[in-house]
Design a protein with these regions (language model features):
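NAD(P)+-binding Rossmann beta1-loop-alpha1 motif at the extreme N-terminus of oxidoreductases
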Residues: 1-53, 60-61, 91
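Rossmann-like NAD(P)(H) cofactor-binding subdomain of soluble oxidoreductases
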Residues: 56, 62-71, 75-149, 165-167
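Alpha-helix C-terminal capping/helix-to-coil transition sites in glycosyltransferase folds
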Residues: 71-72, 191, 243
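Internal alpha-helical scaffold of NAD(P)-dependent oxidoreductase catalytic cores
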Residues: 84, 95, 120, 124-131, ...
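General beta-strand structural signal in soluble alpha/beta enzymes
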Residues: 104, 130-136, 176-180, 239, ...
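NAD(P)-dependent Rossmann-like dehydrogenase/reductase catalytic/cofactor-binding core
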Residues: 199-203, 228-238, 242, 246-332
Length: 332
């Protein structure tokens, strides 16, 4: 049996822990909240973050002790909120076994540095690229927790190590594919959240299919241009991690980014939408980072820029869309 540790027991971390357990691994969840640790360890239930799953697999346990969590780990999965990753992972730097692979479920761009999560993880843990993997795809945590059929992509510069991580999370209902395009996977996972915010806002404001389709396709063009400028393979953006994740995130009330945007479209302020949000909408802190990244790479980011105005200036959905359209005729 492979020993797998999941750092972070939120909804997605716990749902993915269940996938790993269903795949036959020994799974240890690490959390800082004592009530979550006790719930998973003693009752096989995460009533705080994933109450819909009444009984988690018996080969899942939990601890709040960092050293205990990673001591015997073959694979370590990072499922921490993106903006807190650097601080949280610093506590594990001297504890992680030298042979362990580290895989990230995180989707976001670090606001303070503009760096992708692969860069943050490898810098913080002093980890070589061939021991890091990113996992991303159309993976809404509630559906994965309910064991609905789904697929994802595992990226690592070392394809053998990508395969090891993929094998550890392969079940009858969860199918991972592998690639070496870490940059592409990271860019897809991060940038689609900004598009989901915009689509959700348009839906919340009462706009229909044409508007949503326009935002999604322009969002895809924007994130593809950014990704390619950063060194990604353009094909990645038209697969599961790109178009696939965009479809899932922009079309479901299960998506926290879509729901956050919908609440903005209904007239809630950013502060009000944050209060009623169930979990972290990573697109909110990522938006400004995407605009800054576009400036750095000399790539226009009109959608991210308009959503930045929404979040920072409080402009309305109609104003956001008017700004997105502009007045000049351009090529698609």
């Amino acid at each position: 049996m492979t020993n797998v540790t999941v750092l972070g027991a939120g909804a997605w971390g716990t749902a993915f822990g269940q996938v790993l357990a269903d795949a036959g691994n020994n799974v240890t969840m690490w959390a800082i909240e004592p009530e979550i640790v006790e719930g998973i360890r003693d009752h096989h239930h995460n009533g705080v973050r994933l109450p819909s799953v009444k009984v988690l697999p018996s080969n899942m346990t939990a601890t709040g002790d960092r050293a205990e969590a990673v001591a015997n780990a073959d694979i370590i999965i990072v499922a921490i909120a993106a903006q807190f990753a650097r601080v949280a992972l610093a506590e594990f730097k001297e504890l992680i076994p030298e042979t362990a692979l580290v895989a990230s479920l995180m989707k976001g761009i670090e606001r303070t540095t503009g760096k992708r999560m692969d860069e943050v993880v490898m810098e913080t843990l002093d980890l070589p690229a061939d021991r890091f993997a990113a996992i991303s795809g159309p993976n809404l945590s509630k559906e994965i927790a309910d064991r609905h059929p789904a697929a994802t992509v595992v990226a690592c510069t070392n394809l053998d190590n990508a395969t090891k991580v993929a094998e550890a999370c392969t079940t009858s209902y969860f199918k991972p594919f592998v690639t070496t395009d870490v940059i592409g996977l990271e860019m897809c996972g991060s940038l689609k959240n900004v598009t989901a915010l915009a689509v959700g806002m348009a839906r919340g404001a009462g706009y229909g299919e044409n508007t949503a389709a326009m935002i999604e396709t322009r969002g895809l063009a924007e994130l593809t241009a950014l990704g390619v400028a950063a060194g990604a393979d353009p094909k990645t953006f038209f697969g599961l991690a790109g178009v696939g994740d965009l479809i899932a995130t922009c079309g479901s009330s299960l998506s926290r980014n879509y729901t956050f945007g919908a609440n903005l479209g209904k007239g809630l302020t950013v502060e009000e939408a944050t209060k009623v949000s169930n979990g972290v909408a990573e697109g909110v802190p990522t938006t400004d980072a995407v605009v800054a990244l576009g400036d750095q790479l000399d790539v226009p980011t009109p959608l991210a820029y308009q959503m930045s105005r929404v979040l920072n200036e409080g402009i309305s959905c109609s104003e956001m869309l008017a700004g997105l359209f502009g007045h000049e005729v351009t090529g698609e």
